[in-house]
Design a protein with these regions (language model features):
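C-terminal accessory/tail domains of diverse enzymes
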Residues: 2-136, 149-333
């Protein structure tokens, strides 16, 4: 990502209002985020007509209707890299993995100069984000909080549910993680419980399911995917799943470094998770991921039997069910 030198439009720089933005502080005690949702009309030049639906414009200024924030969890931060960045609101100690860097509230926009400027902030923070500089491990997560202007969290949950099967497929190995395994149906009336797949807040949602962010490219791909999910949820809620999958396929291919076989396997699995989110019934395609059959010899076999579909009866033939599951998803294990 190039270093933008243009003086046209919005400029993202460190705020400089407190030294604490460049220090690691105790959990939940980093400074408040800035809401970086406004730009100029110069920044939205190049947006497609459909992407302009997600922007409010008034005179020379524009405001994103969609917003997103990331948590970047690490076991260690590169020496000398902890400082204030335009991207991060601050750094905190985290008891589960060590440290986390938390972004400001960012505009979630389509392909444009504005998006390029957001991605440039990611690149400027590479010594925090990239694994080669600041490592992480399996205990680290990649939580994402997102919102739509004027919408309550529970309303947004109902809208994104039909397009969230891809998140389950991508982060399938975390579906049995105790920190993000509740409310697997993404019910909008579940309340404000924390350890859910997608936590409901008053005016936002937090996907807790994603795994750790390991690179700037990883963060960019997730940004693009979340934009696509919200764009379909808000503007094309009745779109066929096949149309949505065609739209996100280039992003999934990028996530898997162009591996067509893996990308198509993920999209295929997403179809089954989407069906689960529609019916609430677990079947042979999804059970192993929900019950964690890949995390140990047996995982939590049978723990979700109350949600099994009528035609799915693995109880009593445990080993053969495990073998069939592992054979079916060998490429994704």
């Amino acid at each position: 990502m190039r270093n933008l030198q243009s003086n046209i439009g919005i400029q993202y720089t460190a705020i400089g209002d407190t030294e604490r933005r460049g220090e690691v502080v105790s959990y939940h005690n980093s400074p408040s985020p800035a809401f970086l949702l406004k730009a100029t009309t110069d920044d939205v030049n190049g947006l497609s007509e459909s992407d302009k639906l997600n922007i409010n414009s008034s005179g020379l200024f524009a405001k994103s209707k969609f917003a997103i924030g990331f948590e970047v969890e690490k076991t260690r931060l590169r020496r000398g890299a902890v400082m204030e960045y335009a991207l991060f609101k601050g750094f905190e100690y985290d008891s589960s993995c060590g440290y986390e860097a938390i972004t400001h509230v960012l505009p979630l926009v389509g392909r444009s100069m504005w998006r390029t400027k957001v991605f440039n902030m990611f690149a400027e923070a590479k010594h925090i984000i990239d694994e080669q500089y600041s490592p992480s491990n399996h205990k680290c997560g990649g939580h994402m909080t997102f919102s739509v202007d004027g919408m309550y969290g529970h309303q947004l949950m109902d809208l994104i549910r039909p397009f969230s099967g891809i998140m389950y497929a991508l982060f399938r190995k975390r579906l049995a993680n105790r920190y993000c395994c509740e409310n697997i149906e993404m019910a909008s009336n579940f309340g404000y419980e924390k350890y859910t797949v997608c936590k409901i807040n008053d005016h936002s949602l937090e996907f807790r399911l994603p795994s750790r962010i390991t690179s700037v490219k990883c963060m960019m791909d997730r940004y693009k995917l979340m934009y696509a999910i919200l764009d379909f949820a808000i503007n094309k809620p009745d779109a066929r799943l096949s149309k949505f999958h065609r739209a996100i396929r280039p992003i999934i291919l990028s996530m898997y470094e162009g591996n067509v076989e893996k990308a198509d396997a993920i999209l295929g699995l997403a179809v089954h998770f989407t069906q689960f989110l529609k019916t609430g019934k677990i079947d042979k395609y999804t059970c192993g991921w929900f019950e964690g059959w890949t995390s140990s010899r047996y995982g939590s076999f049978g723990s979700l039997r109350a949600k099994y579909s009528r035609t799915f009866r693995p109880i009593g033939c445990q080993q053969s069910s495990l073998n069939d599951f592992k054979a079916r998803y060998e490429i994704l294990l």
